[in-house]
Swiss-Prot record:
GO biological process entries: nucleotide-sugar metabolic process; protein glycosylation; S-layer organization
Phenotype upon gene inactivation: Impaired formation of the tetrasaccharide present at 'Asn-532' of S-layer glycoprotein Csg. No effect on 'Asn-47' and 'Asn-117' glycosylation of S-layer glycoprotein Csg.
Cofactor: NAD(+)
Taxonomic path: Archaea, Methanobacteriati, Methanobacteriota, Stenosarchaea group, Halobacteria
Pathway per the UniProt entry: Protein modification; protein glycosylation; Cell surface structure biogenesis; S-layer biogenesis
Organism of origin: Haloferax volcanii (strain ATCC 29605 / DSM 3757 / JCM 8879 / NBRC 14742 / NCIMB 2012 / VKM B-1768 / DS2)
Pfam families assigned to the protein according to its UniProt record, in alphabetical order: GDP_Man_Dehyd
Protein name: Low-salt glycan biosynthesis protein Agl12
NCBIfam families: dTDP_gluc_dehyt (TIGR01181)
CDD domains: dTDP_GD_SDR_e (cd05246)
Length: 310
């Protein structure tokens, strides 16, 4: 299978490219604009892989996208601006990349008559939930500009399925963690700060709850959905591991050998969703199960970010 992975030099995208090359005979083309969150370094050791080609470029470049899609059987779209705080400070690049960029890919996919288009989305499109778990049938209710643009892209993908019969799939994943994550994200940021004896800024009272999945488990789920998922469907990918931000911070401090005195409660973020939780029953029915515990994943992260496992 010939796979075009957009945003494949970012955190999850690069881990997925590595996963494909390690676990299949697929030919993979990675397209990435190498903005601040993407780097060739994330693909170190794989840039010269015989089944891999890296292309620097933007998903909004229709001519380039057309050239790449013409040789692809499937498209997996990770390309996105993905930081909530940055989206609150300025939404324009999020709208441009996450919505308009997705439209460019969809149009190219339609013209090329591809076999599958997998849109990588997020549980944040559902908004917050205080009890229970979101299923794929729940309405979208995003509460910040980032998640709003991802929800918009999801709806656009769905519309191309309904109006053009494009063979689309959508995955919505909970919070990922693991190697090659940008240092602005909570777990790598707090690991580094804890190890350096710095304070760890926790929004509000730290009670906001997130569901965490190790990135390798997510990549395995994405691969199963890509190959076995039913066209036109949405699949939640979650681990069932829910932790408050304070609990996550305490586990990081314990893993690094820091002190709880390093915790600093700061003013809460605008539009800060209280809790995310998703039901992954539908994805598990395809034969997937998460394998990594949070503690084992965190240990691997500490080794990676503190230089013991390059």
């Amino acid at each position: 299978m010939d796979v075009l992975v957009t945003g494949g030099a970012g955190f999850i995208g690069s881990n997925f490219v590595r996963y494909l090359l390690d676990n299949s005979d697929d030919s993979v083309v990675t397209l990435d604009a190498l903005t601040y969150a993407g780097s060739r370094d994330n693909l170190a050791g794989y840039l010269d892989h015989p089944n891999h080609r890296f292309v620097e470029g933007d998903i909004r470049d229709r001519e380039l996208v057309d050239d790449l899609v013409a040789d692809a059987d499937v498209i997996v779209n990770f390309a996105a601006e993905s930081h909530v705080d940055r989206s609150i400070g300025g939404a324009e690049p999020f709208v441009s990349t996450n919505v308009q960029g997705t439209q460019t890919l969809l149009d190219a996919a339609l013209d090329a008559d591809i076999d599958r288009f997998l849109q990588i989305s997020t549980d944040e499109v559902y908004g917050e939930i205080h009890d229970g778990k979101f299923t794929e049938d729940d309405p979208l209710a995003p509460r910040n500009p980032y998640s709003a643009t991802k929800a918009g892209a999801d709806l656009l993908v769905r519309s191309y399925r309904e109006t053009h019969d494009l063979p689309t799939l959508i995955t919505r994943t909970c919070n990922n963690f693991g190697p090659r994550q940008h240092p602005e994200k909570l777990i790598p940021k707090f690991i580094q700060r804890a190890a350096n004896g710095e304070t760890l800024p926790v929004y509000g009272d730290g009670s906001n709850v997130r569901e965490w999945i190790y990135v390798e488990d997510n990549c395995a789920a994405l691969d199963v959905v890509l190959r076995e998922g039913d066209i036109g469907e949405v699949y939640n990918i979650g681990s069932g591991v829910e932790l408050s931000n304070l609990e996550t911070t305490e586990k990081i401090l314990e893993a690094v050998g820091g002190s709880e005195d390093q915790i600093e409660f700061v003013e809460d973020r605008a539009g800060h969703d209280q809790r995310y939780a998703i039901d992954a029953t539908k994805t598990k029915a395809l034969g997937w199960e998460p394998e990594w515990s949070f503690e084992d994943g965190l240990e691997a992260c500490v080794d990676y970010y503190l230089g013991d496992d390059e």
